[in-house]
């Protein structure tokens, strides 16, 4: 069924101009806010509103972690304006979402400027998605596609992803729905029409890699083909394959203008609200990503969301310069800030020094920020604490080699990787201005491997030199710097020999340290001041050393040699008070890890006197456990076992593993779209592109493994890659994905003022352990079943076992497993433990389908019924059976096998019945049989495969007696002849004599013939009714809402509708009022309004009916027009196409019941159908209903009111009413629903309508009405009554789109309906040459409700006004005279848009 979304797509056209040429008037305005930044949607579908009005998203789109929602939660969200995403699209764990077709119907391009790993589109662990549905997507400019672990996703392998991505891109598609239980691609699209009127053919996948035997059809779903552009315009054509302007367009265009691009290939510009494509930006505009902006727009650009956490970057950092909108000035330019804060880049005369603020280089990333800097307006500190990085000196040379001046000091401390300061190749002078470290401009301390200083002379402006504890640095290198700067002193010159270039031992005094507080990644260490020195100025500071120590056996010199990269980490403390205790916060620790630490002093004492503590140990607080690994579900005999590996990082003491299991029932509607009778042997689609991730860049494998890796693909499509490698890549990608998805909330801080970090932020007062309790702890069985919908359990082991009886056979289950830890314990009463991390890790999902149950698909043998239905013209057998009660998944077809057993060498014949067809017929008809003895067997097929054929049943078809047959034929002909003569004579007499005397109304049913109402069991005491507010005016009087407190002796409080008769009503009108109630007593079905009781004793007379809370269907439809003014915000949404189909089949079911009861409604219209609180539509208002129990029609007299706009031609011409005329009215009701209750035959007077319908005219198709719905209307409007379908046939046609609840309550599935269906003759429907009503319009006023009925006979058939702006337009038919002037078509509203 085509989604309603396709009728409401609004594509924003983009015109094409060349260079800086500006062509006005080519396209319409772009909505305000058409360009959006990155969008992150998580936790609720309501946040999707952030995409409203977005045409381009400059950044990424995240849709993540939306739990506990269903598909209807996404129905009201659609973003047809969005055509382009510049970075990537990521969907992760979004429940309820079945397709992206409604969300992004026009998304054409994903540019991939930034990627998730190597991928520009990731769809991962969406439990309910059934199709991708990005029907307009044509280009993924950079990066690949990763679609993984989506258990219900079909059509992932029917897309040629290579046609979208650049050559060499790796796409990864794995662990989705099996292709053999998915619908197949159609031969042609049902949604796209070519200019010549034919449907678009689905293309075949190109043959790549020589695999000519494997052919695939390319499509997005069962209705939409993938669009593959011709070679001359790759990725730039319309949906019908017409080439666009390939030089300017990307992703399609809007015909007939091939230059009206959906997305611009190069650049776009929006002058005066009209977008245009350009090859380069016009003057006075600046390039920003893929668009041109004005100077003011560039200044107004906000920094990307990915840089929000950088407080040093202004909120609006962009600068217009040289035709580009940049965040930084280019090389040889300097940033100028005017007094009015206007920022611009100025080219320097000659060499332009790039100035940068002082910085602390502690890793390569921080060094990268100084790339190109020449003058440091401040001090430069280098402290590389990392232990690795073989290219670190090359990186420093790349980023710091341009520095020529340092205004402050240069400090190089504890930089293990450095052998030389030669990476500062252009450094000329260190000015030493401002604050200094120990009054020194060059401060070099504790560099274990430093051997050289500068490879050229560097001038020291002010301050002194300070070198301390550089064991590999010779003092002559230090004195060489002093020699070049003779006026500069060395602060500790007398100690140079003892602590530089030598590992001289020092006199050590023990320091007392204590642990004050620990968190998962932090610890606070405290110690008393060192007071052993005679001169306090000789104490330069402290150094704290710490290292991971799992076994508490470390020594002072572990990892301290120059060659080892794994050793003590250290921090220096230069800010201390001699009179107070010193406190140090250790950061970047690992959770639940034991560390060793000690504290050492830095002194200037000539004796080498210093202080040092003992090595002590502490364990950090627990953290959040990482995810469990390698989940595996298996079944052994009658037990189901779940196994997994522990997390790589438990980050605490294991408390338990929580296991939550949820049944993911097979309710995939797409399953029924495939014809398993025709496509029975279709195998899984083998993607022609590799669906595995690329192998690591470097790997070691054995010779056998390498041979296996290089093997050609097997017949099953396996690429022969090493499973271990693929598994490692999956784990790596999942870790990357979690880093994108699960992020900590940043600490709140003032971005305008930098301040020292407070320990309260690292160690909050609230130390209560948090638990991410998202797992549903329910254990709940499926209603009336022995197996479970939800199972929750916990264990300390890495496996858990359940009885297989807990699970339904061959059903899909989602296993969610996570690890949980115990709360942390403080190591001592004096130590504060801060345990604020989540106690449970993230869940890992694993999908598993339980084994099939043997015998579950077998047909119950006692249910098979065989009935010979042979006659004189043909021999046939009716076979009926009941389906298996609990099959292995959904049933897709049945096969009936029959064979002659009285002859040898006669093979079996198979008849295949689709499951949807079986729901209508409940069996099969075997035709064209020869006389003989037959064996018959029935077999069911589910998604698990074929069941066992039933035991053979035998039936004998006897030969015909030729003489007996002849006599029967002769007798039949004689009887037919006599009946015909009598029939003609009777009607000749009737029309010649009786019609002159009296007009007869056949009333054959004795229940209907009486006039006097008789009290019966339906009588209700008046005091058992509570009357409430008015609901509206009925046919006989006011209708009230009420409550029925007692019904047939049983207490109840049932809401009801109370129909009254006017006080001025005559006795005849009261009898007619009660007569309607008498008619209702005979009805008992779900889709006809139910009578509850009658109050006939006393006045006023009351009829108690079932309450229909939403009123009549006509009013309901008009209330749901898009611009209906009801004072609500927002306005009610129009009913969807699926809802309209549901209403249509409910009305047809009610009418089928009336037809089976031999009732003709005569006034079927939207105003006479009622809408219940649960949106069920039922037949109501039987004021004109008549019982024709034994006759086939009812002839209306010449007086009264007739609803001419709903009446069939035979009713208008001859006054004949039958079930076929009700079918004609039913077609008009469908037209009303398609137009939200517009008036039929808009623009014609009632007299014109009467002549128009009698002459064969019908209404034109409503705007945006699907073919199947309008075809049904046309069949209902056949001029010949016998050519119209019956209501039972209508239900059969609409049944595949009906809700499951309909099957449970419908009359259609009752035994009476089945008998009625078997009794109907097959009728060939011929679309007669009728004249459709052509759309025009006029400007009359809205008619009143009484205009729906027209006085006929003695009353005048008066003119009727046209409907309001929602109406269908005036006719232009040659059958109607004096139509009046034609006018432009106004905006009709249809729910089918």
From Swiss-Prot:
Isomerase listed as a keyword: no
A GO CC term attached to the entry: axon
Extracellular-facing ranges: 758-966
Activity regulation note: Activated in response to insulin. Autophosphorylation activates the kinase activity.
Glycosylation sites per record: 76, 196, 257, 322, 340, 439, 457, 492, 553, 765, 772, 793, 796, 871, 919, 933
Record-listed E.C. numbers: 2.7.10.1
GO biological process: glucose homeostasis; insulin receptor signaling pathway; neurogenesis; positive regulation of MAPK cascade; positive regulation of phosphatidylinositol 3-kinase/protein kinase B signal transduction; protein autophosphorylation
Record: active site: 1163 (proton acceptor)
Cytoplasmic compartment residues: 988-1393
Keyword Repeat attributed: yes
Cofactor(s) the protein requires to work: Mn(2+)
Residue span, Fibronectin type-III domain: 507-623, 624-729, 860-961
Physiological role: Has a ligand-stimulated tyrosine-protein kinase activity. Regulates cell number and cell size during development by regulating cell growth and survival, affecting body size and organ size, including ovaries and imaginal disks. Plays a role in life-span determination. May be involved in regulation of other neuroendocrine signaling pathways. Involved in the development of the embryonic nervous system. Functions upstream of dock/dreadlocks for photoreceptor (R cell) axon guidance and targeting in the visual system.
PANTHER family linked: INSULIN-LIKE RECEPTOR, TYROSINE-PROTEIN KINASE RECEPTOR
Name this protein carries in UniProt: Insulin-like receptor
Organism (species): Aedes aegypti (Yellowfever mosquito)
Organism phylogeny: Eukaryota, Metazoa, Ecdysozoa, Arthropoda, Hexapoda
